Amino acid sequence: MSITIYHNPDCGTSRNTLALIRNSGAEPTIIYYLETPPSRDELRQLIAAMAIPVRALLRQNVEPYDALCLAEDRFTDDQLIDFMLQHPILINRPIVVTPRGTRLCRPSEVVLEILPAPQKGAFVKEDGERVIDRAGQRVK
């Protein structure tokens, strides 16, 4: 079972998503995208696989967003991708790729939609929120 996560270890949502993947018994390929950003083609493929607009992958609460005036609706998709490649911190995360699909996992529970294997046991997020019970079932 091949799973890849575009991960930022400084992000709680990314850490929780990685932990949910591991709670399913899988050990994913981890791409630290701030250190090793995707290529232009890879980024385009990820966006297409998620079926989201380019702008939906753009982080807004980081300094380059304001400095580059990215809130303005004057940039093409290609220009937005250029900005994300020049400033990988602008790429929202975590992105997870599995045989069942590709998702921007915000919130982290989105990963459950595409994991090939069920959860193996209880899971509690870093903030204390119970997500999975002892039987491996989603807590509503």
Regions found by a protein language model. Give the residues of each.
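Non-globular targeting/processing and membrane-anchoring segments
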Residues: M1-S2, L85-N92, V97-K140
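Structural alpha/beta surface segment adjacent to cysteine/selenocysteine redox centers
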Residues: I3-P9, T13-R74
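Glycine-rich loops and low-complexity Gly/Arg-rich segments
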Residues: T29-I31, I52-L57, I81-F83, K120-F123, ...
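Active-site phosphate/pyrophosphate- and oxyanion-stabilizing loops and adjacent acidic/basic residues
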Residues: R44, D82, E109
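Thioredoxin-like thiol-disulfide oxidoreductase module
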Residues: Y65, D73-P88
